[in-house]
A protein has these predicted regions:
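A generic structural signal for short
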Residues: 12-13, 69-70, 146-150, 191, ...
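A glycine-rich, Thr/Ser-enriched phosphate-binding loop motif common to dinucleotide/cofactor-binding enzymes
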Residues: 66-77, 150-159, 164, 262-266
Length: 280
């Protein structure tokens, strides 16, 4: 109902889908509540900030419509890592391939993956409802619908959202893949910077970066893996190495819990920032 239920509310977290967010935005904000929205409804609106606190927290203060948008999960964890490199040298280009867990499509999708594994191992026919194909023992190189340029909406979100968050002309080319992991998204990232960045520089920047944990010891087989990082708050970084084809290129691997940092935690961090800065 469109009533005065939000009168006296300082912060409202919304995570009920783009349609619901659009319908109720004015009702939620009309008495001064700050709406922190987890849907895609407002992310690319020019008068609504798109915020990852480790990267562009101050943008949250400029919200003429009383709304702050939470970015897409894959974008959030990527820009937290990119910020550390951007502080060393401007990033010109990013190529990223994502390995996105089943739970990124919702709890029912995660349940379907469980069911599919049981069915395959029992020799039964496989239930396919939440994905275009069987995900168990498979990879699906499509997340969301395809656009006219051959990229999916998920991939284009990474292009547009990254530029808005980082206030940059950075070019992003993404390939987003659904993988049969239960939770936490992984990303293989290649960046081209204006000047060469050494592995040592990058490692130090990641180690000091806000919201990042360095896990990069290949000799001991230590690197981020989704199996062990579900439920963790930070973005983990490893497999840091120089590109062999471009002296200004650097490659690394990140893993983050898309339900925590990729959604809920990021929204809470925005609220904490507003409270801390007395910016409500």
């Amino acid at each position: 109902q469109h009533n005065d239920d939000f009168k006296g509310v300082d912060i409202a977290f919304t995570s009920a889908g783009a349609g619901t967010s659009k319908e109720y935005a004015k009702t939620i904000t009309k008495h001064g509540a700050v709406m922190i929205d987890n849907s895609s409804a407002f992310r690319m609106d020019n008068d609504i900030p798109l915020v990852v606190p480790e990267v562009n927290a101050a943008d949250a203060k400029d919200r003429p419509r009383g709304i702050i948008a939470n970015p897409n999960c894959t974008t959030i964890q990527m820009v937290v890592a990119l910020k550390a490199i951007e502080q060393l040298s401007h990033i010109k280009t990013v190529h990223v391939s994502t390995y996105q867990a089943a739970s990124g499509a919702g709890a029912a999708a995660m349940d379907e993956l469980y069911t599919q594994y049981r069915q395959v191992l029992a020799g039964e026919s496989v239930t396919v409802e939440k994905f275009a194909y069987q995900l168990a023992f498979n990879l699906i190189p499509q997340i969301d619908v395809f656009t006219d340029n051959g990229y999916t909406k998920e991939e284009m979100k990474m292009f547009h959202e990254t530029r808005k968050i980082m206030h940059s002309d950075i070019k992003v080319s993404a390939t987003c893949v659904r993988v049969p992991a239960l939770r936490s998204h992984s990303e293989s990232i290649w960046v081209e910077t204006e000047r060469p960045i050494s592995v040592e520089e990058a490692r130090e920047a990641f180690a000091k970066g806000d919201g990042l944990v360095l896990q990069d010891n290949p000799a001991e087989k230590e690197y981020p893996m989704p199996l062990f990082l579900a439920g963790k708050d930070p973005v983990y970084v490893g497999r840091i190495r120089k590109d062999l084809t471009n002296e200004n290129g650097l490659t690394f691997w990140i893993v983050g819990d898309q339900i925590k940092k990729g959604a809920a935690l990021n929204a809470v961090q925005i609220a904490e920032y507003l409270i801390r800065e007395k910016a409500l």
